[in-house]
Amino acid sequence: MNPAHLLILAAVCVSPLGASSNRPMPLNLYQFKNMVQCTVPNRSWWHFADYGCYCGRGGSGTPVDDLDRCCQIHDNCYNEAEKISRCWPYFKTYSYECSQGTLTCKGGNNACAAAVCDCDRLAAICFAGAPYNDNNYNIDLKARCQ
């Protein structure tokens, strides 16, 4: 089976199983993953899924570094997008383009899709500019993210 299809299947299956204190796995994860791969082609997107205090599920405490701060800003951006009527960023898909490492959100997106696309685009650009520290991958959240 295509890895992309497995990713979508996992997102659909895992999201209802999460604890109530955790946000559901985003269904637009596939698009965000592709944006990250556009701006950071030399590192697997998976390295960003469990990084620091904010990259991945949840988010609390002080970001451990600039990359983690990118994820905190992305979380806050989604919180702002949720203020748009009937906008659920974790489930919203959008139109965008990747060309030679440059991301562009397309003009045909409605207000919610445009906001979510811009959140993801800015996060992917931020990831590209922030150093990656292997010591901040898969950290003990209880110990380091209070």
From Swiss-Prot:
SUPFAM superfamilies: Phospholipase A2, PLA2 (SSF48619)
Cleaved signal peptide residues: 1-21
GO terms for cellular component: extracellular region
Family annotation (Gene3D superfamilies): Phospholipase A2 domain
GO function terms (MF aspect): calcium ion binding; calcium-dependent phospholipase A2 activity; phospholipid binding; signaling receptor binding; toxin activity
Enzyme Commission no: 3.1.1.4
Disulfide bonds: C38-C98, C53-C145, C55-C71, C70-C126, C77-C119, C87-C112, C105-C117
Taxonomy, superkingdom: Eukaryota
Designated name of the protein: Neutral phospholipase A2 B
Tissue: Expressed by the venom gland.
GO terms of biological process kind: arachidonate secretion; fatty acid biosynthetic process; lipid catabolic process; phospholipid metabolic process; positive regulation of fibroblast proliferation
Enzyme class: hydrolase
Residues reported in the UniProt entry to bind Ca(2+): Y54, G56, G58, D75
Keywords (A to Z) from UniProt: Calcium, Disulfide bond, Hydrolase, Lipid degradation, Lipid metabolism, Metal-binding, Secreted, Signal, Toxin
Principal location: secreted
Keyword Hydrolase included in the entry's annotation: yes
InterPro entries, per database record: PLipase_A2, PLipase_A2_Asp_AS, PLipase_A2_dom, PLipase_A2_dom_sf, PLipase_A2_His_AS
Cofactor, free-text remark: Binds 1 Ca(2+) ion.
Cofactor(s) it depends on: Ca(2+)
Localization, UniProt: Secreted
Chain residues in the propeptide: 22-27
